[in-house]
Amino acid sequence: MDISLKTKYEKLIEYIASFSSAAVAFSSGVDSTFLLYAAKEALGNNVIAVTATSCSFPERELNEAKDYCRQFRIEHFIVQSEELNIEGFAKNPKNRCYLCKRELFEKIRSIAGEHGIKEILEGSNLDDNGDYRPGLIAVKELDIKSPLREIGFTKAEIRELSKEFNLPTWEKQSFACLASRFPYGDLITEEKLKRVDKSEQLLIDLGFNQLRVRIHNDVARIELDPKQFDKFMDESVRTLVYKKFKEFGFSYVALDIIGYRTGSMNETLDLDK
């Protein structure tokens, strides 16, 4: 392990150990898994994991969260997010993520309080400062701790240490909630979210790893790692994807020639309005 990275990790452990106990918002993603691992090392049995499940959170992600907590013997709580019932959320406003995160952290705080736990930890990292992240406003408002950002961990460093610690997520692709697949202002429904989930699961089953299926009315815009474009353009793959996507309810299926990138729905977002 790189000396500077080792020192940074030691600072992380020291930071978390300053709390008597903590609840970790755990999605089974790269960041929250690494954070939960560190919290377990720092606090032992005085840490719990809380995962929110909803129609915008695929079952495969929930199952991975359950498996990890069983493997590392971490007490795990699952809460129903029900974000579609949050006032204004379904209209998909620019602050959609804020509305959801605020509700989520309040539920986590309630569970933590029932177990005598004061501190809530979440897994945003230093790289998250460079994108539009309204959810971080809720983090600040509710005094949620962000140890990875506080210590200054980048995504690359988190992956490197995750590999060092043999965490199953060290090379897992980034995931964002399914509600992020729609242009701001487009109505979000449970049916639409299920359509996205089925579409992305099909591509995963076909061997594609880094991907998003963005929805523009009846058009599915597929973002893939450009290195996998040739695989996608195989006639048998294209034909199958088109056939299945039509069954899912899409009229048109398009491959984004730029390829996968995080937050592509933010590219046309005017934050001044």
Give, region by region, the residue ranges found by the protein language model.
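ATP-dependent adenylation/nucleotidyltransferase module used to activate substrates
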Residues: 1-164, 205, 220, 236-250, ...
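A short interface-forming secondary-structure element
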Residues: 215-217, 221-234
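A short amphipathic beta-strand at an alpha->beta junction
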Residues: 247-262
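A short linear hydrophobic-aromatic micro-motif
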Residues: 208-213, 252-254
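Mid-to-C-terminal catalytic subdomains of enzymes
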Residues: 122, 149, 153-155, 159-203, ...
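Flexible glycine/acidic-rich beta-alpha junction loops that bind and position SAM and/or redox cofactors
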Residues: 174-186, 219-223, 260-265
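A structural preference for short, hydrophobic beta-strand core positions in alpha/beta folds
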Residues: 78-80, 213, 257
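Short, low-order "capping/linker" segments at domain edges
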Residues: 263-273
